[in-house]
Amino acid sequence: MNYDRILIRYGEMTTKGKNRNIFVRRLKNNIARKLQAFERIQIEYMRDRMYILLNGEPHEPIIEKLKTVFGIHSFSLAMKCENDLDAIKETALAAVRQLPYKGKTFKVSARRVDKQFPYRSDELNYEVGAHILRQTDGLRVNVREPDIDVRIEVRQDGTYVTCRDIFGAGGLPVGTSGKAMLMLSGGIDSPVAGYLAMKRGLEIEAVHFFSPPFTSERAKQKVIDLVRKLTTYGGRIKLHIVPFTEVQQAIYQGVPNEYSLISTRRAMLRITDALRRRQRALAIVTGESLGQVASQTLESMYVINEVTNTPILRPLVSMDKLEIIELAKQIGTHDISILPYEDCCTIFTPRAPKTKPKKEKVFHYESQLDLAPLLEKAVNDTETLVIDEETGQGDEFAELF
């Protein structure tokens, strides 16, 4: 007897009340897309849990993929049997034998959801535990801190047996919180911000500012690779590549050096907001962390934000750099981010950028420029790629958007 299904437990979704079914259906669809290569699996869901019926598919690669699906609190390999004491004993024994149990400790934790079942939970614990002890060597009982917790749940449709919990990614299913535009550079911070935004249920579309010939095709490929890594957690993602050279040169030539960084960020935000309206998103996500660099002081953020009323979400705002780097390593974006290819944020860098810019001065300097047609041209000339986890870079859809 082998494990024939995977039991999935929801996390935060259990607090969603009347909207829970919306979250559960979205999670089911996200899992189905994630596991589309496993053609024989079936997904069954109910209000408080979900099952993946393996139907002969290998469980190891499925488990690895489930670890990256937001909305899953934990999951376990499971076996199902009839609501019969002997069947439950044999199923629990088979579940334990699937594990390296010698020299380990265990306990049985039974839960009788079906009150028509003739044995109480404590009786099940004793009967099943005694059977496992008799039929195995090198396994001992420890009811406080066991190595193996044999969980038995007797429900009306059958009894389910699990032995090991695997923690999921947590959060909410991607797509349940709406859509946002992620301002994605080639650095460490913004991919982590995108990951955390998706963890809160946001579908993201990435916006990258590309300034050839000052930035290379390798820098562009680096961003594509970062988006591909993020698709591990959020599924297919659109990447909007904005030609930014003309805008950046106009600012560099027309705005005093110490204010050029602020005006550049304001232009980026204007363009991202225009793309947001086009894509019907409701927010903008950035990788800003308060106080890290000159453009991320509170005074700078205030002046930069002035160009839009759109909500700006900053998932990293309370994190220090070491925390961000550690999370980047965990999600697999760090090694891509540190590749030595310049992006538009590292060219034309002012020698001494203002950390407390004056809004009136920014307005004055920008009023001397005719940026509006350049911004509109950048939006209209934006190239859009669709990046997919399984197939890599998708087709170009710039003409459709």
Curated annotation (Swiss-Prot):
Subcellular locations according to the entry: Cytoplasm
State where ATP binds: 183-184, 208-209, 265, 287, 296
* One GO CC annotation: cytosol
Q: In which pathway does it act?
A: Cofactor biosynthesis; thiamine diphosphate biosynthesis
- Gene3D superfamilies given for it? 3.30.2130.30, HUPs (3.40.50.620)
> Chief location of this protein?
cytoplasm
According to its UniProt entry, the protein's GO biological process terms are:
thiamine biosynthetic process; thiamine diphosphate biosynthetic process; thiazole biosynthetic process; tRNA 4-thiouridine biosynthesis
Q: Identify the Pfam families for this entry.
A: ThiI (PF02568), ThiI_fer (PF22025), THUMP (PF02926)
Enzyme kind, highest EC tier: transferase
Q: Sorted alphabetically, which keywords does the UniProt record give?
A: ATP-binding, Cytoplasm, Nucleotide-binding, RNA-binding, Thiamine biosynthesis, Transferase, tRNA-binding
Q: Which PROSITE patterns does the record associate with it?
A: THUMP (PS51165)
- InterPro entries cross-referenced by the UniProt entry: Rossmann-like_a/b/a_fold, ThiI_AANH, ThiI_fer, ThiI_N, THUMP_dom, THUMP_ThiI, tRNA_STrfase, tRNA_sulfurtransferase_ThiI
Q: What is its EC number?
A: 2.8.1.4
What SUPFAM superfamilies does the record tag this protein with?
A: Adenine nucleotide alpha hydrolases-like, THUMP domain-like
User: What range(s) does the THUMP domain occupy?
Assistant: 60-165
Q: Which GO terms fall under molecular function for this chain's record?
A: ATP binding; CCA tRNA nucleotidyltransferase activity; tRNA binding; tRNA-uracil-4 sulfurtransferase activity
Q: Which reaction does it catalyse?
A: [ThiI sulfur-carrier protein]-S-sulfanyl-L-cysteine + a uridine in tRNA + 2 reduced [2Fe-2S]-[ferredoxin] + ATP + H(+) = [ThiI sulfur-carrier protein]-L-cysteine + a 4-thiouridine in tRNA + 2 oxidized [2Fe-2S]-[ferredoxin] + AMP + diphosphate; [ThiS sulfur-carrier protein]-C-terminal Gly-Gly-AMP + S-sulfanyl-L-cysteinyl-[cysteine desulfurase] + AH2 = [ThiS sulfur-carrier protein]-C-terminal-Gly-aminoethanethioate + L-cysteinyl-[cysteine desulfurase] + A + AMP + 2 H(+)
- What is stated as this protein's family in its record? Belongs to the ThiI family.
Q: What does this protein do?
A: Catalyzes the ATP-dependent transfer of a sulfur to tRNA to produce 4-thiouridine in position 8 of tRNAs, which functions as a near-UV photosensor. Also catalyzes the transfer of sulfur to the sulfur carrier protein ThiS, forming ThiS-thiocarboxylate. This is a step in the synthesis of thiazole, in the thiamine biosynthesis pathway. The sulfur is donated as persulfide by IscS.
UniProt xrefs under NCBIfam families: tRNA uracil 4-sulfurtransferase ThiI
Q: What is this protein called?
A: Probable tRNA sulfurtransferase
Q: Which organism is it from?
A: Geobacillus kaustophilus (strain HTA426)
